[in-house]
């Protein structure tokens, strides 16, 4: 499934937001959990699907305010 890709993309955005002082450190896992629970993860995603999931996850992680 695509959960590792979702985790990675959400984590990268959350850390960027933390370093920019937009969120607190303890909000990083909240953003990751939100993305994992809201992005649909196919059981065997294609490369194109993974790229789309990455874009969707980064957008959601940027917009989510824990």
Annotate each predicted stretch with a short phrase.
Residues 1-66:
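Catalytic, metal-anchored helix/loop core of enzyme active sites in primary metabolism
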